């Protein structure tokens, strides 16, 4: 029972410490949300669908 207060204090100290990144950020670090890869992928897929003459709803497209 003597260890319980010590355990509680340690847990409170751990919870109150600020989170720190494992590695420092560099000027080249970009958050994933700022990438436009999904827009580019959609544009490329739309171009491929148009080249293959697929239906508008893409149900007749056979990718393979």
UniProtKB/Swiss-Prot annotation:
Positions bearing Isoleucine amide: 63
Domain of life: Eukaryota
GO function terms (MF aspect): toxin activity
Residue positions assigned to the propeptide: 23-52
Signal peptide: 1-22
Keywords: Amidation, Disulfide bond, Neurotoxin, Secreted, Signal, Toxin
UniProt modification remark: Contains 2 disulfide bonds that can be either 'C1-C3, C2-C4' or 'C1-C4, C2-C3', since these disulfide connectivities have been observed for conotoxins with cysteine framework V (for examples, see AC P0DQQ7 and AC P81755).
Pfam families (alphabetical): Chi-conotoxin (PF16981)
Domain notes: The cysteine framework is V (CC-CC).
Name recorded for this polypeptide: Conotoxin Ts-011
């Amino acid at each position: 029972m003597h260890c319980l207060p010590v355990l509680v204090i340690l847990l409170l100290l751990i919870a109150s410490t600020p989170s720190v990144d494992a590695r420092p950020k560099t000027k080249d670090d970009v958050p994933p949300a700022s990438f436009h890869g999904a827009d580019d992928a959609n544009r490329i897929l739309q171009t491929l669908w148009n080249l293959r003459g697929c239906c508008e709803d893409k149900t007749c497209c056979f990718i393979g």
